[in-house]
């Protein structure tokens, strides 16, 4: 899948654009149905393609040739070919640059030329990678020492999603010293804060980011004093970064990981009652995410009975943690059953 997403038929190279036309024609019909059955499900998980695909190229072919032509009809049809070339040249380039390019003084043009083109199963657009794109060279320029910002930082995402704590750390690290960084960050924060719900519900990946964003919000009146401290804000930022790292991992690697068994002897008798981080909105969104995941997979006919049961259990657990969070915020003592759920949380997760 990675190979299909990265190997492109670059529009600026005529032979490759011709290959893209032929591949699109080859995909038409039954082959398209098979391709789409893979594409729509992976889009449900990770989002739609950032690159040009069959969806963009087939309409261009129809417009240039007056319909879907036979391959034999392409030979000698110079007018159709020239029209097709002009239509593909006018298509939007990808929002995210995934191709290393040399800086020769005309980097904008070169990057666009090296990236824009047809891909069989294009890599997916994600909000966080779009954030990164705007905060590295050459969208930001050198700092006072002449250094370029060649790599992004996880804190870029947190700051763009609204975390003042993350932005403060970036300032301390010197990241805001790169020319254009502050301006680009402000633009990103404004655009994201004004984004519609459609952006966050477009895929499970986007929905996960939306689920985590309450961790980045400043806790005001109504929260316990310890949750309104700068230390708690940093702890929440670390929680966000940890789950974000797992989210990135989940979208590129699907190998099973070895786990330790729960148990192994009697525990000493101590007061081991735990607590739930009182993030009511996070638990609410997590419950909704589990429910929507089950509904989406079921609609594609890809949800086994066991997986449906597990997703329903996840949603139920999130609802229970939401209830506990509300109790903690109102200084209401948890029940023994609720303390038991916290105590055995890891063991419950182990069996999903």
Name each region found by the language model.
Residues 2-352:
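Long, non-catalytic protein-protein interaction scaffolds
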């Amino acid at each position: 899948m990675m190979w299909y997403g990265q190997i492109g038929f670059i529009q600026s190279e005529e032979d490759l654009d011709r290959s893209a036309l032929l591949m699109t024609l080859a995909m038409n019909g039954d082959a398209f149905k098979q391709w789409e059955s893979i594409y729509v499900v992976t889009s449900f998980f990770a989002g739609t393609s950032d690159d040009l695909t069959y969806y963009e190229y087939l309409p261009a072919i129809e417009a240039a040739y007056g319909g879907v032509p036979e391959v034999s009809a392409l030979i000698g049809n110079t007018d159709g070919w020239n029209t097709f070339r002009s239509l593909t040249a006018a298509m939007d380039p990808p929002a995210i640059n995934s191709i290393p390019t040399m800086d020769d003084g005309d980097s904008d043009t070169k990057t666009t030329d090296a990236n824009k083109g047809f891909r069989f199963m294009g890599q997916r657009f994600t909000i966080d990678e779009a954030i990164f794109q705007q905060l590295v060279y050459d969208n930001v320029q050198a700092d006072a020492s002449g250094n370029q910002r060649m790599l992004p930082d996880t804190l870029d995402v947190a700051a763009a999603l609204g975390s003042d704590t993350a932005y403060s750390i970036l300032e301390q690290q010197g990241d805001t010293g790169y020319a254009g960084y502050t301006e680009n960050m402000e633009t990103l924060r404004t655009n994201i804060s004004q984004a519609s719900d459609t952006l966050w519900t477009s895929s499970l990946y986007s929905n996960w980011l939306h689920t985590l964003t309450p961790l980045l919000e400043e806790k005001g009146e109504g929260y316990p004093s310890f949750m309104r401290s700068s230390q708690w804000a940093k702890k929440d930022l670390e929680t966000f970064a940890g789950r974000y790292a797992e989210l990135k991992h989940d979208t590129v690697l699907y190998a099973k990981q070895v786990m330790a068994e729960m148990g192994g002897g009697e525990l000493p008798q101590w007061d081991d009652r735990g607590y739930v981080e009182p993030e009511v909105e996070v638990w609410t969104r997590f419950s909704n995410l589990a429910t929507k995941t089950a509904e989406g997979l079921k609609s594609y006919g890809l949800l086994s009975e066991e997986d449906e049961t597990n997703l329903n259990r996840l949603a139920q657990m999130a609802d229970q943690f939401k209830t506990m969070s509300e109790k903690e915020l109102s200084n209401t003592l948890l029940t023994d059953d609720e303390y038991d759920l916290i105590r055995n949380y890891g063991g419950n997760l182990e069996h999903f």
